[in-house]
Each structure stands twice: as C-alpha cells, then as structure tokens.
Amino acid sequence: MGEKLWEEYEEAKALGIETKPVLTGPYTLLKLCRYTGSKTAEDFTDAVIAAYQQVFEKCAAHRIMWLQLDEPALVRDLSKEDIALFHKIYENVLPCKKTVRILLQTYFGDVRDIYKDLTELPFDGIGLDFIEGKETVHLIEKYGFPKDKLLFAGLVNGKNIWRNHYDRTLNQLQQLTGKGIQTVLSTSCSLLHVPYTVKHETKLSEKYLDYFAFAEEKLSELKELSGFAENPSYTQESVYKKNCALFTEDRDCENAAVKKRLSEVTEKDYVRLPKRSERQQLQKETFHLPQFPTTTIGSFPQTKDVKQNRAAFRKGEITEQEYTCLLYTSD
C-alpha cells in the first residue's frame, strides 16, 4: 500500500488545511474491474475488504477527520447479489473506522435500489445527487433520513457550466432542513467536469459571462448559498437579487433565427428524403466507389519534416505547389 494519501494529508495539515481524502469506494472498485477467465468480483472481495480495513486504520492513526468513499456504481440497477456484495464489504470495513467519519458519496443518478440499506448502515454522512437523481427527493420523503447522519445534498450542478438558480436551491434546502435533516450543501458531483474559472474567458461579453459558473464560481455559489441559508433576510441581499434576475429577465443571447426554425419543425422533418434506395443510386453515380472501398481508421503518423512543412505553408513561407512536392518527397 502506498503512502501518497497520508503524505499529502500531512503536507496540507502542516499548512493549516484540514482536508478530506477521497478514494474510490470498494464496491465501485470491484464493479469497475475487468475479470478474466472464470474470475468474478466475489473472488477478490476478501482482499479488497482487507485493503480498505488497513486504509481505515491508517486514517485513524493519522487522525483524519473525514474520509470520502465514492460509490457511483450504486446508481446503476442493482440485483440482490449486488446488494449482498455491498453489505458484505461494508459490514466488514466500517467497524474499523474508529474515530474517522466516513462519507459515502454517490452521483450521476439516484440510489433507489439500495437507499434503505445505505441509511441503515453506520455511515456518518451520505452524499446524494439531487440533479440527476430523479428519485432522490421521493426516496427521502418516503423513507426519511436518519437524524444521526449528515446529508451531503448535491444541489449545485457539478457537470454543467451554468449559474445555479439560488431561489430554487434555497427552497430545496429549506425543505430538507425543515424535516430536521442535518444538511451539508454540496455539488452533485466532482467539479472536474467543468472548466477551471470564468476569469480567463476574456473574449466573451459580460452579459454572457453572468450566466456561466465554472469550478471556482461554483465554489463561490456554495459559499453564498450557505450564507443565505443562515440569513433570514437573504432576499434583500444584492447578490441574491442579481441571481434571481438571471432567471426572470429575457436572455438576449438566444438566437432568434434558430429559435424560429426550431418552432417550425414538424413530424415530416424527421423523415429523411429522398428515400434510401434513391440516395444509394445518387451516391454510386457521384462517387464511383469500388464494391469494397478501403480506407484507414485514422490519419497517418506525421514526421517532424511534415509538421515543419505544414507550418511553413500556413505562414506563407512556401507556395502550395512547393508544399505538395514536399509531401511526396518527405520521409
């Protein structure tokens, strides 16, 4: 077992930063592995359990407060065997957590097949996706959420590039806290799916940039939303009003011509014309292809000379005729 996780944790701690290490969860790890021959996930379960037990023990030794285990495989359709495998893993590893608090994080969907099982196991926190998890709200309403656990509510979209609708998110947040659920506001998934920051978008008009939220901006949104959640008079805040205006005022970034064309689409437009037999004949007459045309599956490797010649041609340093001749003579 490597030392990277604990070395980086201690490095951050020395700088006064308390981090939350994140690992792929054991269930998802087993489900994502490729097995050969007659081997299955069950053949490696005991070894994986032993490895994560060691991880928990080392986290406790380093006095890590929170350890996040990502289990996105739980949003798939789960069989009884899948659920049994999940139980076997966590019933063996969770007793080793000692003082470490374990966050089970899910994303890219809801956990309808295993929600009750998750809430009954001794996790300290459970992360749920409220964006792509279409059944997440219904599951909480139907089965409730344990008062002794933290709900990491993925209410800010971690995959798209758009601003969060503060009013809508705060209403969802209030519904959760109104049920007595201890809630931590979070993104629906990791922010690795979006660009780093809007600050570097120097060629876009400010009126368009106002609608964008990349990774840094989404972190700012979380901070602002958290502040509003604790402020009874947040509706009077200028930041809140500015956000509301984004969703109440008409956007001039819409292309009227495209919108008009879309509104005129009919069922007939989904039928390709002319019919296939006529297209096939036209293609034969136009392209004169052999019976079995052969091509490559990609471009040919480019040598250093080819790249230099292309650059020279683009800069106007050589003519098209010279460039063509070089293509035929280059090694």
Q: What name fits each language-model region?
A:
Residues V22-G37, R63-F86, L191-E201, V306-K307:
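Active-site-proximal loop/short-helix segments
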Residues L15-E42, L191, E285-T324:
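N-terminal small/glycine-rich loop or linker at the start of catalytic domains
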Residues I83-V100, L222:
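Alpha-helix-loop-beta-strand connector modules within alpha/beta enzyme cores
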Residues T19-L23, L67-L69, I102-T106, I126-L128, ...:
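Hydrophobic faces of well-ordered beta-strands that scaffold small-molecule active sites
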Residues A12, C59, E71, L118, ...:
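Conserved, mostly hydrophobic/aromatic
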Residues D117-A213, E224, F228:
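Catalytic-face loop-and-helix region of soluble metabolic enzyme cores
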Residues Y328-D331:
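Conserved small/polar residues in nucleotide/adenosyl-binding loops
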Residues M1, D210-T295, Q302-D305:
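Flexible inter-domain linker/hinge segments
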